[in-house]
Amino acid sequence: CLCPAQILLNYLPLERALWSSLLKKQRDLYSQFLKEMIIQPGIAKANLGVSREDVTLEDHPLNPNPDSRWNTYFKDNEVLLQIDKDVRRLYPDMAFFQRPTDYPCLLILDPQNEFETLRKRVEQTTLKSQTVARNRSGVTNVRSSSPLKSSPSSLSEYEVLPNGCEAHWEVVERILFIYAKLNPGIAYVQGMNEIVGPLYYTFATDPNSEWKEHAEADTFFCFTNLMAEIRDNFIKSLDDSQCGITYKMEKVYSTLKEKDVELYLKLQEQNIKPQFFAFRWLTLLLSQEFLLPDVIRIWDSLFADDKRFDFLLLVCCAMLTLIRDQLLEGDFTLNMRLLQDYPISDVHLILKKAKELQDSK
């Protein structure tokens, strides 16, 4: 399990005596983020005998001012819809993310607070019958589609828990929404859900009830720290820079050339570019190539390595060399199928091979 993730991702210091005060400070800070960023303009506190706020021009949904709270709310909904679409299908083969958490966010669910759940916000938004997607170029596309309840399959996908309950995917949705609000330069890009998922799963299933209870806040800060290291992978304008994803994909091939020139030449001869498979491997830290427990095992080794993302390149090379015989014999079509649906599930074998490649330098 990722027990040391909080330390390896620089969330906690090595000195255990400092943990209690730091954790309280960070968890309180996250609660403050929720209070400031998940609020519906124009809504008065309920059940407190407070009448509805007077609707001034400044606080009117049709206010043309780009800085108005309503305008911000509507813009946020575009980001939220993309997050919502992605987190609902997070690890669909596992029941975990559809199950209710034992620790729902009381701040959001308390009817006396002027907050709404993001789930209800998605259901209520006027954009609910459209598909919103923000790609790595930062372009937001809104495409008309049928309403969510138009088919049995979509209906079952959007089944919700009773009031007062939250599914784990809803917690992940909130983490990503707060991250997007605090990081407007990158906001949310598809794939970030695959990065936050394993972190949250690890904390939310920890045997220690304290880690479970505060999984949302702790995941948020660990995810933020991890994204600080890999966010350039999600920014298309940086692709061709030395910190961009294109450079890293080429580094996979240059490393392979050092370790197995015959295999490298075969892939070159077949015009199999690293973009065809290594883009997903690197950007999502292999989270789509293996089952979640195996992803966590890989990440454990990755985060523990001083040069963690150099080690990721070696893991990718190990994956290639372990199927070298099949790749050397296969044609373009067969080899592409192998690389896009990697056949080896034994991550211990892959990590052992990566360590051998590392030691052979």
Language model regions located:
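Helix-rich, well-folded core regions that mediate interactions or catalysis
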Residues: C1-K361
